[in-house]
Amino acid sequence: MTELPRLPAQGGCSNAPILKQRGQREVFCGLTGIIWLHRKMQDAFFLVVGSRTCAHLLQSAAGVMIFAEPRFGTAILEETDLAGLADAQAELDKVVDQLLARRTDIKQLFLVGSCPSEVIKLDLSRAAERMTEKYAPSVRVLNFSGSGIETTFTQGEDACLASMVPVLPKTDTRQLLLVGALPDVVEEQAVSLLEQMGIGPIKVLPAPRADTDLGIGENTVFALTQPFLGDTHGALERRGARHLPAPFPFGEEGTTAWLRVIADEFGVDADTFERVTAAPRARARKAISQASEALRGKTIFFFPDSQLEIPLARFLTRECGMEAIEVGSPFVHKGIIGSDLEMLAQGPVISEGQDVDLQLDRCRAARPDLTVCGLGLANPLEAEGLATKWAIELVFTPVHFYEQAGDLAGLFSRPVRRAGLLKVEAAE
């Protein structure tokens, strides 16, 4: 197959020093992952064991009312629970009994830890084991933490998927596993492209239903669709599955490279690959070219938020003509984002973790044309004359693969255009 143009090793950021700082950080907690996971897993329920603050976060972030009976809820820890005056395990059993009696459609129940449950050391793993014995085989009960003490924004999904891997059945079937929650229409596009190349069987984690025929074994190869799945990556390898390292499928170049790694693994010939990808590649290039006109020559600064930052910086610098000043990520897992680091030209500061005050100082000194940051930082930076993009939008908006490449570029070009218009109006 014809190789993608690659930067020489000395030109990429694979060996660039990583600035590691620890201090005050500004991120959402991992509970926010429930917002997209509950839509993907149609027979699952996410029961957060937490405070009223946790409940308000989920309800407002999801944009649904509780009377609509979504597939998530909160078991409220009262003052008696927090003070140790009540048996929290017994109270949790009562809540789960009531929930499963009312919602007979639930086949997977996730007990989700929060800051309050972590503080009082409530052992949800023990509760999950106890409930699994009680409700099996009708309901599978698992647990993971979405606590802000332990997790950042997107780590909730990682913790959820990692909790599922050990209980998946063993299979010896040669198969491809796509790992990471994607919007249904995006997932269908990816699967369709791979199937047109003759690749199969293709499985997806998370599967929409617990009874889906999904197993893991030594003949399973997996490709990550999200760069924040470090724990899931490790859990799959411990089950014998093999990772296919690749750039992440953002933009035309990243999508083509991601597909090519899989195609090479399954012996797809160059003509077939070209036939399947030529048209969508051309559409993606055209869409990116139109959407990124305002981005060329502009500078960008990433605060750490979702772990999407390094792949997105690669896309914006190589396909949209931007210059990255700093690319901050909560974690830099080179086994996962190594290919993107290799393709990211030397120059930007690569930072892991956060001391938000020090990072704000660097951002103010650099005065980038666009700053990607969390909601809490956006308004203050806008007030200082810096254009911003909410990092959360990059997770909740379909941005993967060819057909969304133009939309991805547009997410960054719109605030840059808006800032330009505001400057013109101010000058007048």
From Swiss-Prot:
Name the source's superkingdom: Bacteria
User: In which residues is [4Fe-4S] cluster bound?
Assistant: 29, 54, 115
| UniProt entry tagged with the keyword Oxidoreductase | yes
What is catalysed by this protein?
Answer: chlorophyllide a + oxidized 2[4Fe-4S]-[ferredoxin] + 2 ADP + 2 phosphate = protochlorophyllide a + reduced 2[4Fe-4S]-[ferredoxin] + 2 ATP + 2 H2O
Q: Name one Pfam family in it.
A: Oxidored_nitro
Q: In which pathway does it act?
A: Porphyrin-containing compound metabolism; bacteriochlorophyll biosynthesis (light-independent)
Q: What is its EC number?
A: 1.3.7.7
Functional note? Component of the dark-operative protochlorophyllide reductase (DPOR) that uses Mg-ATP and reduced ferredoxin to reduce ring D of protochlorophyllide (Pchlide) to form chlorophyllide a (Chlide). This reaction is light-independent. The NB-protein (BchN-BchB) is the catalytic component of the complex.
Q: Note the PANTHER family from the entry.
A: LIGHT-INDEPENDENT PROTOCHLOROPHYLLIDE REDUCTASE SUBUNIT N (PTHR39429:SF3)
Its name, as the record gives it, is: Light-independent protochlorophyllide reductase subunit N
Organism listed in the record:
Roseobacter denitrificans (strain ATCC 33942 / OCh 114)
Record lineage: Bacteria, Pseudomonadati, Pseudomonadota, Alphaproteobacteria, Rhodobacterales
